[in-house]
From Swiss-Prot:
NCBIfam families the UniProt entry points to: tape_meas_lam_C (TIGR01541)
Chain intervals with Basic and acidic residues compositional bias: 380-397
Sections of the chain in a coiled coil: 399-419
Role noted for this protein: Serves as a ruler that controls the length of tail by stopping the tail tube polymerization and is probably released from the tail shaft during infection to facilitate DNA translocation into the host cell. Assembles into a multimeric linear form probably arranged as a coil of alpha-helices and stabilized by the covering tail assembly proteins. Its C-terminus fixes the tail tip complex, thereby forming the tail assembly initiator complex. Tail tube proteins polymerize around the tape measure protein, displacing the tail assembly proteins.
Official protein name in the record: Tape measure protein
UniProt keyword annotation of Cell membrane present: no
Signal peptide as annotated in the record: none
Source organism of the structure: Escherichia phage N15 (Bacteriophage N15)
Stretches that traverse the bilayer: none
Keywords: Coiled coil, Viral genome ejection through host cell envelope, Viral long flexible tail ejection system, Viral penetration into host cytoplasm, Viral release from host cell, Viral tail assembly, Viral tail protein, Virion, Virus entry into host cell
Superkingdom of source: Viruses
Residues covered by region (Disordered): 378-397
Name of the gene: gene 16
GO BP terms: symbiont genome ejection through host cell envelope, long flexible tail mechanism; viral tail assembly
């Protein structure tokens, strides 16, 4: 204010002015105000020096030291902010910068005294605002340079990763969404690209895994990224090196990658190696964080909190990705469209405002279209960059192969000439010194001369396939001829042909064929070497053949010895059994022989009589004998077995009729022969014999059927027919002691006949009369089958019932036999046909 007033005075002061007095008064007034202001400033400066002097005195240092310490504070605060932004440990920053501040003020307590005595709330606010403004400006600058840094990375790396700056920005955003900071992900991504990780890799997963691992372990990012770069060059070798350095992959994973690479699947091998490495780093990160102590975990959380705060500040200047721009444009258009739809029909809105709303909507729509176009262009750029990176990688690979192959195809003279021309051109253009030229040219000449001194390799002689096949067949022929001669010279059972003897013949035949082949063609190096060692090979084979023959003979002798020992054991046990069975029955002697056979079999197998296995077998055999003895005492089982055999024989209609027909045809043939030779035949005996066999067959079947029916119907005494039984009528009641026939037996005998049996009459006469003689049959055949029913009880009533049942059986049997004979003698029957053929 004082300077402005004096300046105005200098400009406006004019001696000739009519208002000189007024101006002079004005000057005096301004000078007075200037003096007062100067006095106030001097007083304030004096008070400030007093405060500084007091603060310095409280801190125990001089005013000069105090002023120097205060001047260092802004620099200390700047270092703190920079280190926090760089992701360093907050505790380490506190120890480092706090120690410097403490040393500046002479200790911890003097530091706080000095700060409390000099820093007022206003100064704190102004300082905080200044620091915040500076940090905000720094964050904006860092964020705005993100795309520029990404572009520099892609250009300097040749963009072998096949990415764009926008794609890198999106990948960093993905890492930020996954819990990392933008700087962590972008730094890991940048180092991976610089390390040479090629296109097609999963940069999002890899960059996040690297960022997490380096943050938890403290390993430099560039070191981990370099390990990924080795995978791009050679997946198997790179994975082995990574396992040796970080121990994050297993041998099985390395073997899988190697198998893919050997099969020619380079892309699959690289992808598998990247996946194995990423999974390994993630597992190690989790293990490190899970094993942190309480203090270490708290420090790690605080460090990540500072990083997140600084990362949020850096977001101020960072550009948006194409997708984020589209999302924001869509939100802006949606909002503008909603406002337009809300206001376009509002009668309180004038035309100017309505036009403004429409313009806002159209502007938002155009911005959305532009954002979508930019997103499409970004996607196209990403795809094109990926294709170009892959193509460039292949071109470089094949160029390196071509260069290596070209060097291999050059002759020694061509290499020397090219080197000489290169050196001459460099010398002519002044790009090489004469001394260096002489040394390089002499080295090239010596290398050329050394190649001339090397002996030329003669091409290896290869035996044609046809010659090899002929030699093999000839060797087999000679071998078989030798084997045939040995077999023809066989004189005794001790002649042997061991496997080693056959190998000797094979070697002899092989050498014979080689010697014959040497006369007609050039032998290969292998064949010459084999032929040179003929004597040694054959002598060794001859020795082996003799040993082999001895082994075969000894094996045969051992087998004979074993057979002899087994025979001695068998005869010894058989002799002992024979001696012990003297005076025994045939059955007991047979059992003793079986026990002796069991024992000699066990001994010949290598066991002894006291073995538990043999004792178990002997007990099982004796248990079988005991069961046989038990069955011999069971007469009922014997009777049942006999009846079962009888029933089985009677039910074999096929076998019985076959035997009957065979006997009949034989009898007819014999009678015919007798008629032709002697003029007469005994047809009566033949017919009688035939009828007797037929009667036996019918009688067997009748008895089996009758007994089966009777055994299922035992129990009636004085009962009667139970009736057929209607729908609601019971079929009768059976009382105790009654005999009940089955339905089939009742139908076969007849209800009327059964009633007549109960009364004493039946077909054929009175049942209870003075006995029924044998039924007479045609041709003089008599059938007599008496039936007796045994009853163990002495009850008279039951005895009478048994007599009646026996008579009923006899009547049924007689009727069945007579009916069968009657059918046989009728026209068409067996007997009728046999007798009428004469």
């Amino acid at each position: 204010m004082a300077q402005t007033a004096v300046g105005d005075l200098v400009v406006n002061l004019d001696v000739n002015s009519t208002k000189f007095n007024e101006q002079l008064s004005y000057v005096k007034k301004e000078l007075k105000q200037t003096g007062n202001t100067a006095n106030d400033e001097a007083l304030r400066i004096q008070q400030s020096f007093s405060r500084q002097e007091n603060a310095a005195r409280k801190a125990g240092i001089s005013v000069g030291q105090y002023n120097a310490a205060m001047r260092m504070l802004p620099a200390q605060f700047t270092d703190v902010a920079t280190q926090l932004a760089g992701g360093q440990n907050p505790w380490l920053i506190l120890l480092q910068q706090g120690g410097q501040v403490k040393d500046s003020f002479g200790g911890i307590i003097p530091t706080f005294r000095a700060l409390l005595g000099t820093i007022s709330p206003l100064m704190v606010g102004i300082g905080a605002l200044s620091v915040a403004t500076g940090a905000l400006f720094y964050a904006w600058y860092q964020g705005s340079s993100t795309l520029s840094d990404f572009n520099k990375t892609l250009v300097l790396s040749g963009n072998t990763a096949g990415l764009t700056a926008d794609r890198m920005l999106a990948l960093a955003r993905n890492g930020q969404a996954a819990g990392l900071t933008f700087n962590q992900t972008s730094e890991a991504l940048t180092e991976l690209i610089n390390a040479g990780v090629r296109t097609g890799s999963r940069f999002d997963e890899m960059s996040q895994a690297v960022a997490r691992f380096t943050d938890a372990s403290g390993v430099p990012v560039e070191k981990v990224a370099a390990a990924y770069g080795k995978l791009a060059t050679d997946p198997t070798s790179g994975l082995i090196a990574m396992a040796q350095q970080f121990h994050n992959v297993t041998a099985e994973q390395i073997a899988h990658v190697a198998q893919l690479q050997r099969a020619g699947d380079e892309a699959g091998a690289l992808q598998a190696a990247n996946e194995a490495a990423t999974a390994g780093f993630n597992d190690q990160t989790k293990a490190i964080r899970d094993n942190m102590g309480t203090i270490e975990s708290s420090a790690d959380s605080l460090k990540r909190a500072f990083k997140s705060m600084w990362d949020a500040a850096l977001d101020i200047g960072r550009p948006d990705t194409a997708q984020e721009m589209v999302a924001k444009a869509e939100a802006a258009f949606k909002k503008a469209d909603e406002i337009w739809n809300l206001r376009k029909g509002d009668r309180y809105v004038n035309d100017e405002a309505r036009a403004r709303f429409w313009n806002d909507r159209e502007t938002a729509r155009l911005a959305l279209d532009m954002a979508q176009q930019q997103a499409g262009i970004a996607r196209a750029n990403e795809e094109n960059a990926s294709r170009e990176a892959a193509a460039e990688s292949d071109r470089q690979k094949y160029a390196a192969q071509a260069q290596a192959n070209y060097a291999k195809t050059q002759t020694a003279l061509e290499k020397y000439t090219a080197r000489q021309s290169e050196l001459n051109k460099a010398l002519k253009e002044g790009r090489i010194l004469q001394a260096d030229y002489n040394i390089n040219l002499a080295a090239a000449k010596k290398e050329y001369e050394d190649t001339l001194k090397k002996p030329k390799k003669t091409p290896a002689i290869r035996t044609p396939a046809g010659a090899r096949a002929t030699d093999t067949a000839s060797a087999q022929t000679l071998e078989l001829q030798a084997q045939l001669r040995t077999l023809q010279e066989h004189k005794s059972i001790n002649d042997t042909i061991s496997q080693q003897r056959q190998e000797l013949w094979r070697q002899q035949s092989r050498f014979t064929v080689l010697e014959e082949a040497a006369k007609t063609r050039t032998l290969s190096a292998e064949e010459k070497s084999l032929l040179a060692s003929k004597s040694e090979v054959l002598s060794r084979a001859e020795l082996n053949a003799k040993l082999g023959d001895q082994i075969v003979a000894q094996e045969r002798l051992n087998r004979l010895q074993d057979t002899s020992q087994k025979y001695v054991t068998q005869i010894g046990e058989k002799t002992r059994a024979l001696a012990e069975s003297a005076g025994m029955s045939s059955r007991a002697a047979q059992r003793r022989n079986e026990e002796a056979q069991l024992l000699q079999g066990w001994k010949n197998g290598g066991g002894s009589e006291n073995d538990a296995g043999y004792q178990n077998e002997l007990q099982a055999l004796q248990a079988y004998y005991a069961e046989q003895d038990k069955l011999r005492d069971d007469w009922q089982s014997g009777a049942k077995s006999a009846w079962a055999d009888y029933v089985d024989s009677a039910s074999d209609a096929y076998g019985q009729m076959k035997s009957f027909a065979t006997s009949t045809f034989d009898g007819i043939g014999q009678n015919m022969a007798d008629m032709l030779t002697r003029g007469k035949a005994d047809w009566a005996d033949f017919t009688r014999s035939t009828l007797s066999m037929l009667t036996q067959i019918l009688l067997k079947q009748a008895m089996v059927g009758l007994v089966d029916s009777a055994t299922t119907a035992l129990g009636f005494a004085g009962g009667g027919y139970t009736g057929s039984g209607g729908k609601y009528e019971p079929a009768g009641v059976v009382h105790r002691g009654e005999f009940v026939f089955t339905k089939e037996a009742t139908n076969r005998i007849g209800v009327g006949n059964l009633y007549r049996m109960m009364k004493g009459y039946a077909t054929g006469g009175y049942v209870g009369g003075g006995g029924t003689g044998p039924a007479a049959a045609p041709f003089g055949v008599s059938v007599y089958a008496p039936v007796t029913v045994e009853n163990a009880s002495g009850n008279a009533q039951q005895q009478n019932d048994g007599d009646r049942l026996g008579k009923a059986y006899q009547q049924v049997i007689n009727k069945s036999v007579n009916d069968g004979i009657a059918r046989a003698i009728q026209p068409g029957g067996l007997i009728w046909n046999a007798t009428n053929r004469r």
